[in-house]
């Protein structure tokens, strides 16, 4: 059978702990996207660094295998909704951490109007009231694929699935008040 793989950290901590500009930027992002802690932000920053590192390596590489890997990277980023279909490898280098944070399930639930606030969106997800593609997802940091974006709804067994739920009525009124 073999031993299970060793669990590794999925994030890198900053190289210096007290750089004021970075701390201010992290505080703003943490508040804007209602992240639980900086570790969530660092996880997405590390993911972005990995995409950018691969893109830089592939820009310098030549050959058939490099071309295959270029296409795979661009397809992956397109599926995640981070890049358009006609994007070039240089576009990967211009991605920001906010682009990645915009693809989180928590952010998309809020933007779709299923929750009044981004914090409420997080709570709905963790409590199992949101499903993606018919599957309940309990991780607010789940990166939603482009084809799954339209399938984000309230879970069938959730009380929020009923149109007459009091909280849904409040959310609908808030939507109508924002449009007027």
From Swiss-Prot:
Pfam families: Ribosomal_S4, S4. One of its GO terms (molecular function) is structural constituent of ribosome. It comes from the Archaea. Coiled coil: none annotated. Residues 103-165 form the S4 RNA-binding domain. InterPro entries: Ribosomal_uS4 (IPR022801), Ribosomal_uS4_arc (IPR022802), Ribosomal_uS4_CS (IPR018079), Ribosomal_uS4_euk/arc (IPR005710), Ribosomal_uS4_N (IPR001912), S4_RNA-bd (IPR002942), S4_RNA-bd_sf (IPR036986). PROSITE patterns: RIBOSOMAL_S4, S4. GO terms for cellular component: small ribosomal subunit. Keywords: Ribonucleoprotein, Ribosomal protein, RNA-binding, rRNA-binding. NCBIfam families: PRK04051.1, uS4_arch. Part of the 30S ribosomal subunit. Contacts protein S5. The interaction surface between S4 and S5 is involved in control of translational fidelity. Belongs to the universal ribosomal protein uS4 family. This is Small ribosomal subunit protein uS4. It comes from Thermococcus gammatolerans (strain DSM 15229 / JCM 11827 / EJ3). The gene is rps4.
